[in-house]
């Protein structure tokens, strides 16, 4: 059994060259990235009681699952974390490696999914950001991800809620009307309700500590953390 959805991998491999183009196919992710980075950084600092510095994450071992071209791996590395980035798309990893080398960043990138990591070393923090809606089997994926997390470690999972509003905004609006994303980027049937995600995680020794919405304000072109989880949401789990 594995968590890889070949159709999804092919879809993202086709546009892999555009990962680092802020005006390309991944423009929405570039706009979304600053709030994700801030949320992750602030929560890690708080939970691990880190005294902030230039490199606040310097003692943190972090695994970025479904890292794509490295949009989150690189900022985490710059913040001092020891980063491993994995993705099932060889093309994505090639792009990520090239960009990290160009920027003299030491990131360990591998073509893999969680169940494929052979050394099974444990991490302080795992990022599953905008990935669970693209995997083959979410239960298996969370189970395998959880195995890689240290006791009391943090797992961040960000995804899309399965609501009428998410269908209207994330698919009809973002893909068909505003053309922010290529048509077919998302499949509403694979969106996950927070209650489902919490249940699956609970079965895998993960306790929910935080659940927040992330909403886009079209008027000022910015993302904000809110209580509204009806479209995009982010969770923080702690390993029991």
UniProtKB/Swiss-Prot annotation:
Pfam families: Methyltransf_11. It catalyses: a 3-demethylubiquinol + S-adenosyl-L-methionine = a ubiquinol + S-adenosyl-L-homocysteine + H(+); a 3-(all-trans-polyprenyl)benzene-1,2-diol + S-adenosyl-L-methionine = a 2-methoxy-6-(all-trans-polyprenyl)phenol + S-adenosyl-L-homocysteine + H(+). Pathway: Cofactor biosynthesis; ubiquinone biosynthesis. Keywords: Methyltransferase, S-adenosyl-L-methionine, Transferase, Ubiquinone biosynthesis. Transmembrane segments: none annotated. It is an enzyme of class 2 (transferase). GO terms for biological process: methylation. The keyword Metal-binding does not apply. The keyword Mitochondrion does not apply. S-adenosyl-L-methionine binds at residues 36, 66, 87, 129. CDD domains: AdoMet_MTases. Its EC number is 2.1.1.222, 2.1.1.64. GO terms for molecular function: 2-polyprenyl-6-hydroxyphenol methylase activity; 3-demethylubiquinol 3-O-methyltransferase activity; polyprenyldihydroxybenzoate methyltransferase activity. O-methyltransferase that catalyzes the 2 O-methylation steps in the ubiquinone biosynthetic pathway. NCBIfam families: UbiG. Belongs to the methyltransferase superfamily. UbiG/COQ3 family. This is Ubiquinone biosynthesis O-methyltransferase.
